[in-house]
């Protein structure tokens, strides 16, 4: 059941909003997370690229589709140019829907409330 009073209202239940709500609830604040859509992670907003430090904070490795270490480029003459290191992860490609859900779930598990299908139009 939703409260009538919150310390913080976070607008947008994407990865950043979910992470912010999680951290705020961990610090003891009451948080309402508001999302205009009826489902977390839909519609898709952007590609699912998560840098290693963010993934380490979230720990949602079960959402990873592939690891990206860099690229191999080839000149017209066939010379290979290596960008990055195959032994080092530069970014993770994730399933955005699952990743978004996982981040929001962290905030809910910490005590945040979630309000879906709600679009704020005014604040005082």
Question: Where are the regions that the model predicts?
Answer:
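Conserved N-terminal helical subregion
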Residues: 67, 73-124
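Short alpha-helical segment within the catalytic ATP-binding CA
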Residues: 19
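Glycine-rich FAD pyrophosphate-binding loop
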Residues: 9, 22-45
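N-terminal FAD cofactor-binding segment of flavoenzymes
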Residues: 37-76
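Glycine-centered loop/turn motif at secondary-structure junctions
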Residues: 28, 58-59, 111
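Residues within well-ordered alpha helices
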Residues: 23, 54-57, 106
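Fold-independent oxyanion-binding glycine-rich loops
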Residues: 13, 36-37, 76, 118
